[in-house]
Amino acid sequence: MSTVASVKDFVSSFMLTELFKGMALTGKYMFSRKITVQFPEEKTPLSPRFRGLHALRRYDNGEERCIACKLCEAVCPALAITIESEVRDDGSRRTSRYDIDLTKCIFCGFCEEACPVDAIVETHIFEYHGEKRGDLYFTKEMLLAVGDRYEAEIAANKAADAKYR
């Protein structure tokens, strides 16, 4: 190292130039517009295509939509869906068991796309938790309850997204 360079380094470190450069950068961003969202109090808008908690839908007459074709179970890459079906007296087939293990689910939306009758949908609900592993194992009754509770929102999101499908 040359003498000039070492003197320059000594003066630079003695005058704390790196510290002042850092302080200038901090000052520059301190007064700029904040982009951080304080989550529980503030929420950002969600897209109509947001994929959150699953729900099973019903027809207007109260009958569940799922026809037990098992396409959603077949297309699920995480193998998170389990379906068992039974044949009714009128010859139609309906599910006797429809379970989704949310600890396995990757929320890809393939189940929703594969469903020919729009029975399984992903809602805008993302604030749910489980204290035990079994709490994130949703049964048919739980999924139908979610669908019944949020049917108006689900229908509005489906209508908003219809022109893009």
UniProtKB/Swiss-Prot annotation:
Residues binding [4Fe-4S] cluster 1, per UniProt: 66, 69, 72, 115
Keyword Iron: yes
An annotated GO cellular component: plasma membrane
GO biological process: aerobic respiration
Cofactor field: [4Fe-4S] cluster
HAMAP family from the UniProt entry: NDH1_NuoI
Domain of life from the UniProt record: Bacteria
Residues reported to bind [4Fe-4S] cluster 2: 76, 105, 108, 111
Annotated EC: 7.1.1.-
Biological role stated in the UniProt entry: NDH-1 shuttles electrons from NADH, via FMN and iron-sulfur (Fe-S) centers, to quinones in the respiratory chain. The immediate electron acceptor for the enzyme in this species is believed to be ubiquinone. Couples the redox reaction to proton translocation (for every two electrons transferred, four hydrogen ions are translocated across the cytoplasmic membrane), and thus conserves the redox energy in a proton gradient.
Gene label: nuoI
Membrane topology: Peripheral membrane protein
Keywords, ordered alphabetically: 4Fe-4S, Cell inner membrane, Cell membrane, Iron, Iron-sulfur, Membrane, Metal-binding, NAD, Quinone, Repeat, Translocase, Ubiquinone
Name of protein: NADH-quinone oxidoreductase subunit I
Family listed: Belongs to the complex I 23 kDa subunit family.
Cofactor binding note of this UniProt entry: Binds 2 [4Fe-4S] clusters per subunit.
Catalytic activity: a quinone + NADH + 5 H(+)(in) = a quinol + NAD(+) + 4 H(+)(out)
Taxonomic lineage from the root: Bacteria, Pseudomonadati, Pseudomonadota, Betaproteobacteria, Burkholderiales
Assembly and interaction partners: NDH-1 is composed of 14 different subunits. Subunits NuoA, H, J, K, L, M, N constitute the membrane sector of the complex.
Residues of the 4Fe-4S ferredoxin-type domain: 57-86, 96-125
Primary location recorded for the protein, binned into one broad class: membrane
Record localization: Cell inner membrane
GO MF term set: 4 iron, 4 sulfur cluster binding; iron ion binding; NADH:ubiquinone reductase (non-electrogenic) activity; quinone binding
